[in-house]
Design a protein with these regions (language model features):
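Acidic catalytic motifs of isoprenoid enzymes
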Residues: 1-166, 170-186, 197-243, 251-264, ...
Length: 291
């Protein structure tokens, strides 16, 4: 359910691309420093966006350094270090990845996910005193989501997606006590709903073939159509829902006093979401794509 929130590279200035990579690599290094080597494999672009957005709400000066890493052992990469927003994003990166593994185990008894979750569990408690209340919020929201998915009958896609949307709204608005917290919440809420729905559409064929829960199939496929037939009937509906969510994200973003990185953030919310949506709706395989 992660990795959909990325810049549109075609519309990105070179300096903005380098800044995005510096946050991404900084997040990777922070995960290693705060949680260990293993959790670094969970890094995703969505949490990079979170770090950039939250760091852009304050006029603090970033510290840039050049370091080697396991992926790029020869050439040093520019990273942002000692950054409060990145530390916050690192925690949620690890925590959400852990609960995603638990969901995989619950869904299909995945042995791989079961083993990985046991290894990852000890890491999410490394900063438990600092982030204890956030762990409870993640746990409660995702448990509510799983209950709603199991009892999907007579529920709308809005009702089911609410739990994940509320969680992402909580994550964005709970960083600090800004006077524009409400806009942060609704930006996060609509982004979470967008992620939940686009992920469901991306996985629709696989989930239908494996007879797994998929909110789009379970809510809308009343006539039990096969994938090809059903996709043709539902595509415009999903397009409409995703465009509305993306529009609400941008509207709330425009109400927030962004101090820096505005061009990069605007690129992600204006062009990146629409590009990703277009590719997923066309059936492009995004699994191995990277920036």
């Amino acid at each position: 359910m992660f990795g959909y929130v990325t810049p549109c590279k075609m519309e990105l200035k070179i300096k903005e691309y380098e800044k995005f990579r510096a946050y991404y690599c900084g997040l990777c290094k922070t995960i290693k420093r705060d949680y260990g080597e293993l959790p670094r494999v969970t890094i995703n672009y969505d949490m990079t966006f979170l770090a950039i957005l939250l760091d852009s709400l304050e006029n603090n000066k970033n510290i840039f350094v050049k370091e080697h890493c396991i992926v790029h052992p020869v050439k040093k990469k520019v990273i942002i270090t000692n950054n409060e927003a990145i530390k916050y994003a690192a925690f949620f990166n690890v925590a959400l990845s852990y609960y995603k593994l638990l969901d995989n185990v619950e869904d299909d008894g995945s042995i791989k996910s079961n083993i990985s979750s046991k290894f990852l569990k000890k890491y999410i408690h490394k900063n438990k005193n600092l982030y204890k209340k956030h762990i409870h919020s993640v746990d409660n929201s995702l448990k509510s989501l799983y209950v709603s998915e199991k009892n999907y009958k007579d529920k709308s896609i809005d009702e089911i997606s609410h739990h994940f949307a509320h969680l992402t709204g909580y994550i964005l608005s709970s960083y600090k006590d800004f006077n524009f917290k409400e806009n942060l919440y609704w930006l996060g809420y609509n982004l979470g709903k967008w992620i939940y729905i686009i992920d469901a559409f991306d996985d629709l064929e696989k989930d239908m073939n494996q007879k797994k829960f998929n909110v789009i199939n379970n809510v809308y496929n009343k006539n039990n159509l096969n994938y090809k037939e059903f996709k043709g009937t539902i595509k415009d509906k999903i397009d409409f829902l995703l465009v509305n969510c993306a529009s609400a994200c941008l509207n709330n973003f425009n109400a927030i006093p962004i101090v820096k990185n505005k061009g990069l953030l605007y690129n992600i919310l204006q062009f990146g979401l629409m590009e990703k949506m277009e590719r997923v709706l066309k059936g492009v395989n995004l699994e191995n794509e990277s920036l």
